[in-house]
Regions:
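C-terminal non-catalytic regions of proteins with extracellular/luminal or membrane-system context
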Residues: 3, 24-25, 32-421
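Flexible, acidic loop-helix segments that line cofactor/substrate-binding pockets
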Residues: 14-30
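Long, well-ordered, tryptophan-enriched scaffold segments
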Residues: 2-12
Length: 421
């Protein structure tokens, strides 16, 4: 922090120029950046039968849920109780995206905490009268100074929950709306993984919006109506249940790993699969991408050498889109147990329909190092599995990189030092 302050000159000139601050803070460029960040962060988790994107010629849409018209919750934790800039809620974003021929009806339905279902009737009626329902649920952010649990935030520093399920009766609200038979889209507002098993099994479309910020309502609407093709990918693993915690993609080969790969007749727990609800790196698009022609050049290197991985990616759909190509590695044999896969690079590639591009990744000794039993960072000679795919669980292309022993210092078991230096 001190180095950054020195770099910015804050020790010699610690004061800001008020006139310049007025021009810069919340400028048009900053608002556009906030919108783009929200768009790119949204992850499409489910889209059964291509329910999304929606047509803007719908006659009626029901927007339901405690986070549908909640500006503060879109801003996340550590948000002032009084927000000076305007915030576009998801309800407002949907209203602004449709024409006058589309009737948008809003019903809160429930609170985020508590067991009050008195708003269910209004929500059910709104869903029944609409062509489509958008249910916006998730978490409560902010600060509370009361002992009433129902007035507390559910996410943020100092606020813990005992379950990863939706709090209060929000899960029941989704079920009630879905039971009307009206096609339903669930939008999540949250800062931690939510185990939405029922929705994942029964609701045709789920959009993970996180804490999308002041223009989050427009960003979500842009995704819902196809003005922006979703390209976000999960930077976390979403478990099916709190019983799966800790849940992360780069685990060591364990009983759970082998069970998930057919070691027993069970595929995980007695009650549910052992795989996550949504894996690390996962995210859908409104188009399809095909991977081909994996090349590892050269296929064999010395421990101190560099390597390049190439893959061809093609947009096989009818819409322009952005694919996030991910590179994972795994050392098959080594002196210590290594993770089943480790992310070593990713690239966002924009592709027009039918367009194909070659994506390349550079692998250096730092990428291949492991911490040995002597607590030294080393590159251990052997076979490395090279995996390129759409997520940690969707790997269409695999290859092998052979690393040979080198006579030089700092390789094959000798101390390489800190790989981050």
């Amino acid at each position: 922090v001190l180095e950054e302050k020195f770099r910015l000159g804050l020790f010699t000139d610690p004061y800001v120029d008020p006139e310049r601050a007025v021009k810069i803070v919340h400028s048009k460029a900053h608002q556009e950046l906030a919108l783009q960040a929200a768009r790119e962060g949204i992850v499409l988790l489910k889209n059964e039968k291509n329910l999304l994107p929606l047509g803007k010629n719908l006659k009626s849409i029901a927007v339901i849920g405690p986070d549908a018209d909640n500006a503060l919750n879109q801003l996340g934790d550590y948000t002032p109780s009084k927000v000076l800039q305007p915030v576009t809620t998801i309800l407002e974003g949907i209203k602004e995206s449709v024409g006058p021929q589309t009737k948008v009806v809003y019903a809160k339905g429930s609170n985020i905490l508590g067991d009050d279902k008195s708003g269910f009737g209004e929500a059910i009626q709104a869903a029944k009268s609409a062509e489509l329902a958008v249910v916006v649920v998730g978490e409560e952010f902010g600060e509370s100074h009361t002992t009433n649990r129902e007035d507390h935030p559910t996410d943020g520093e100092g606020y813990d929950v005992a379950s990863l399920d939706l709090t209060g009766v929000q899960g029941d609200l989704i079920k009630a709306v879905s039971a009307t038979g009206t096609p339903t889209v669930v939008v999540l507002i949250n800062g931690r993984p939510l185990s939405v098993r029922w929705a994942a099994a029964h609701v045709p479309a789920i959009v993970e919006a996180w804490e999308p910020g002041e223009l989050g309502g427009k960003a979500v609407a842009d995704v819902l109506f196809g003005d922006y093709n979703p390209s976000g990918r999960l930077a976390i693993t979403i478990p099916r249940s709190v019983g799966q915690l800790p849940a992360y993609y780069d685990s060591k080969p364990s009983k759970a790993y082998w069970i998930n790969h057919g070691w027993t007749h069970l595929d995980g727990y007695v009650e549910m699969p052992g795989s996550p609800l949504y894996p690390f790196g996962y995210g859908l698009s409104y188009t399809q991408f095909q991977y081909s022609n994996l090349r590892i050049d050269p296929p064999k290197i010395r421990a101190e050498g560099n390597d390049t991985v190439y893959v061809d990616v093609q947009n096989a759909g009818k819409r322009p889109g952005i694919e996030t190509v991910q590179l994972y590695i795994h050392e098959r044999v080594g002196p210590v147990s290594t993770p089943v896969e480790q992310l070593r690079g990713f690239q966002r590639v924009a592709l027009a329909p039918g367009q194909k591009k070659t994506v390349s990744f550079r692998l250096t000794p730092k990428d291949l190092m492991l911490l040995d039993r002597n607590m030294h960072w080393v590159v251990v000679p052997g076979a490395f599995e090279i995996m390129v795919g759409r997520s940690s669980a969707d790997i269409p292309l695999r290859g092998t990189l052979d690393v040979e022993r080198s006579g030089g210092p700092g390789t094959s078991g000798e101390n390489n030092g800190d790989p981050d230096r």
